[in-house]
Structure formats: structure tokens, C-alpha cells
Amino acid sequence: MPLSVSLPSKNYDYDYDSVQPYFYFEEEEENFYLAAQQRSSELQPPAPSEDIWKKFELLPAPPLSPSCRSNLAAASCFPSTADQLEMVTELLGGDMVNQSSICDPDDESFVKSIIIRDCMWSGFSAAAKLEKVVSEKLATYKASRREGGPAAASRPGPPPSGPPPPPAGPAASAGLYLHDLGAAAAGCIGSSVVFPCPLGRRGPPGAGPAALLGVDAPPTAGGGSEEEQEEDEEIDVVTLAEANESESSTESSTEASEEHCKPHHSPLVLERCHVNIHQHNYAAPPSTKVEYPAAKRLKLDSGRVLKQVSNNRKCSSPRTSDSEVNDKRRTHNVLERQRRNELKLSFFALRDQIPEVANNEKAPKVVILKRATEYVLSIQSDEHRLIAEKEQLRRRREQLKHKLEQLRNSRA
């Protein structure tokens, strides 16, 4: 798929003549980008995929961690997880782990990687070129593996974790290689996880041998000076961390200090959430019970409770008024009964004090009151009479005393 680039021309009448197609030729191998750039520098302008790195060039990466290649070496014929990851990274893009704790920093094939250039930034399809390069890499890796088998068996290292594999012939070695390649590819991380975020963090100290991939500064394809700038920027693409009991304490302290200044990326977790979508079916018969969402149901329940309380208050207000009236009436009746009883008892007591009606138990209250009035008046008249009689008796006494005194004086 050719890309066309137009340069600004001073003669505006020939702007459309300045548009020249940009082609990629298939004679070159993995470094065909540099060759295409050198060839097209005289004929046509650079493609947008070549100078786009200059626009998105990031800051230099921090200093790298010390190499742990010696810790990852194993003496068994069955390669470890780190060896499998190294194999896959060498197979799928040259030196994708340039300047990391696994590979040597002098390999610059990551700058010329076909997969990164094509999948991430180029605008054309390079399937045939990719198949060609991958097949060549596969053949070279098979040859190097067959030659390096005895040398790998003589390397010192810890005993193998599993049982030793059976003696491998050509078919068995190919099957073992495919098994190793599948196991290593299963442990890899996709390119969508590799390239969006910068790499500046380390894996957790308790994790096993795992690959944490990320891009700190993208490569630029523009000549030797730009490649030297990339070397100064120290591109760190892959960092492998192996859990060692002796290094767990130091890594935990450094991790605690780095967590404050660097974000922690966790795998994306997709949770299912239920969205309440209620659509009325006009063709369905009307139902007495209507389903509502949880929030509406709570609001309706609360509204119903409030309505019930208000209705209960409205209904209970006459009931409470009637009950209050009944209570008042009952209280009034009780008090009236007590008053009548007291009045009757008082009439009975008054009747007992009047001699004329004292023995008449059926005497009416009016008769009792009349006889009581007459009796009181008679008692008052008797009182006045007795008082006058007492006064007469006192005077008589005085006269008698005076007469007695005169008699005593005459005898003396």
C-alpha cells in the first residue's frame, strides 16, 4: 500500500506535480528501512513513519539495574523460563531486549526491527517480509541450538527441576524446540501491553521469573547520529526479575521507595455490570404487578410507607377523638357518681341529725332539707333563750354576792 507525501512548493501552480509516490522495495532484508531511506533521500522525501519518532521522542531512561544474567544460567538440557523468553525475543524482532539484564547492549537490531516498525508505525503490510525473516531466524536458531547443545550441557548450574529429557533425534529435537517455543510464547506479553507505557519499574520481589515489558524511548531511524543519541538515552525494553531469597530484602526496600513516584500497572479487570433497561411491551396484556428498578422500588416503598402513615393518622384522628370523648365521658361519669354518692351520704347524715325524719329512711331530700331548716331555726331560738337566761342568772348571782357582803359587814 503506497504512501504519498507532498512537499510545500514555492510555485503554487505545480503543487500537484510535487506529489511523488513512496515505495518500499523487497530486495533488502531486515535493514531495508535504512537502505530505503538512503535511496530515497535523493529522490523523495522521508516517509511519515520515519520521522514520527522525532515528534514523540521521550526523555532518557533512568540508570539500569545490575545484570542478573549469571543468575539465570542453567546447566540442564531443558531451558529455563528466562532462556525461553530470550529465545522468543531474539526470534520475534532482533534485539527487543536491548540494554536489558539479558542481552548485550551493543546489538542495535531493535532499531531496525521489522515487527515494531511495521505493526506500530508503518502504514503498509509486510507479511511476506516478516515470514522471510522469521523463517531465517528459525533456521539459524535451530543450527545454533544443535551446535550449542554439548556446550550448554557442560555449563555449571543448579540441578534440573524436572527429569532429564530422553536422547533427542532430529524429530525429537524439533518437537522439543516447538514445545520450548510454545511454552516461552505462552509466558510472553502482547505488544499492546509492551509499547503504551514507559518502563521504569521492577517486578515484585516475590514473583517468579517473569517478563515485564515496556518502552521507555522509541527508536528513530534517521542515520548514525540519531542512533548514537539512542545509545545515550539507554533504551530499556525488557527487564527480567527472578525471585532470590538473598535479594528479596533489598528489592523490597527499593520497590517501596519507587512506588511513591511511579504508577503501578495492574492487569485490566473487566467486571460484568447489570444495566436495568425497562421497555414497556404495549402488546402484552396489562399486569397488576409492575417491576421497578431497585432505586425506584425503594423510593416507592418509602412513599407507600409515608402514605400509609399519613392515612393512618387521618383515619386514626376521628378514632382518637372518639376515644378521647369516651374517656372524658367515662371520667365525668365516675366523678358524677362519686359526687352523687357523697351527696347521698351527706343527706343521710343530715337526716340522722333531724329528729322528725331521723327514722324515715325513705324521706325525700326536699323534706329533709325543710326539716333541717326548721330544726336549725329552732336551735337558734333556743340558743338565744338560753343566752338570756344565763344573763339573768349571772345578774342574780351578782345581787346575791353583794347582799352576802353586806350581811358579813353588819355582824362584824
Swiss-Prot record:
Residues 144-173, 208-263, 309-328 are annotated as: Disordered. Residues 156-169 have a biased composition (Pro residues). SUPFAM superfamilies: HLH, helix-loop-helix DNA-binding domain (SSF47459). The keyword DNA-binding applies. The keyword DNA-binding applies. Efficient DNA binding requires dimerization with another bHLH protein. This is Viral myc transforming protein.
